[in-house]
Amino acid sequence: MTTILSVRLKNKVVIGGDGQATLGNTIMKSNVKKIRTLYHEKVIAGFAGGTADAFTLFEMFEKKLAMYQGQLPRAAIELAKDWRSDRMLRKLEALLAVADKDTSLIITGNGDVIQPEDDLIAIGSGGSYAQSAARALINNTTLNADEIVEKSLNIAANICIYTNHSFTIKELFSEK
């Protein structure tokens, strides 16, 4: 499992995640890159779940982004439709957190595409810890999105045994 967190504040969206890969109760790798830029670096995405499954979904999602000229909501919906309707794809176990300069979404294997009302996304085993920390920091500090993501991931990593302190953090800016 893992922790992926996305925070959108002012004119910036940031997605960060840890790098731990586990097999059962064993840490197999501590520096997996679970955050990627896609579609000419106009979309950032992170995954929670099986690594091989997530990379398969990243490839499919990148093809959908190209097919729909980078329209994030449309590409996400089309990926979710395929994921839900294809027998082989339904067996993939992963969640995607994706964002462009305007929109943040969660894509699930159940065919759900969810846009959080507060532009805060947290997925994975440490997601609820990171989300709680991020909400508290957003409401009670003047930290920027990068700082909130890093501090929240640190809090999650201190609590969740499936989350480590090896973070990858990426950001996008909007004209807003």
From Swiss-Prot:
Keywords for this protein: Allosteric enzyme, Cytoplasm, Hydrolase, Metal-binding, Protease, Sodium, Threonine protease
GO MF: metal ion binding; threonine-type endopeptidase activity
UniProt xrefs under Pfam families: Proteasome (PF00227)
Listed SUPFAM superfamilies: N-terminal nucleophile aminohydrolases (Ntn hydrolases)
Binding-site residues for Na(+), renumbered to this chain: A157, C160, T163
Regulation: Allosterically activated by HslU binding.
Reactions accelerated catalytically: ATP-dependent cleavage of peptide bonds with broad specificity
Active site, per annotation: T2
GO CC terms, sorted: HslUV protease complex; proteasome core complex
Function: Protease subunit of a proteasome-like degradation complex believed to be a general protein degrading machinery.
Family annotation (PANTHER family): ATP-DEPENDENT PROTEASE SUBUNIT HSLV (PTHR32194:SF0), METALLOPROTEASE TLDD (PTHR32194)
Family of the protein in this entry: Belongs to the peptidase T1B family. HslV subfamily.
Assembly and oligomerization: A double ring-shaped homohexamer of HslV is capped on each side by a ring-shaped HslU homohexamer. The assembly of the HslU/HslV complex is dependent on binding of ATP.
Name assigned to this protein: ATP-dependent protease subunit HslV
Species annotation: Buchnera aphidicola subsp. Schizaphis graminum (strain Sg)
High-level lineage: Bacteria, Pseudomonadati, Pseudomonadota, Gammaproteobacteria, Enterobacterales
Gene name of this polypeptide: hslV
